[in-house]
Amino acid sequence: CAPITFGAHSFVGPQFKAYTVQHPLDAEERNAWYERALPITVGDNCWFGGNVTVLPGVTIGDNCVIGANSLVTKDIPDNSLVVGSPAKVVRQITEADKLGLKELLG
């Protein structure tokens, strides 16, 4: 096993999955039960939509949003909006994305 680490204030939707075990492609190694585990690290303030899958060895930066049904196979930089299978960075999350709810709700 390898650790799965979440930063502060990160949330996951229903059916979130994170896999740390990596199996070899080579049949001989696989039949001998060789495998390894790679850690998964999630930064602060991340949000994962429903049915997201994260594969072994991935690091997700701070302040990321991962859209529903995404398959995360590679590292994701800070402040990224990510969607798809395989998941791709669509754009960076900026100050313009704030809804101003804090001010509206007082």
Identify the meaning behind each predicted range.
Residues K74, R91:
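Short helix N-cap motif at coil->helix boundaries in the Bergerat
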Residues A2-I4, S70, D78-S80, K88:
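Glycine-centered loop/turn positions within well-structured domains
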Residues F16, V54, S70-V72, A87:
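Short coil-to-beta-strand initiation/turn motif
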Residues W47, V65-G67, L71:
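A generic "structured core" feature
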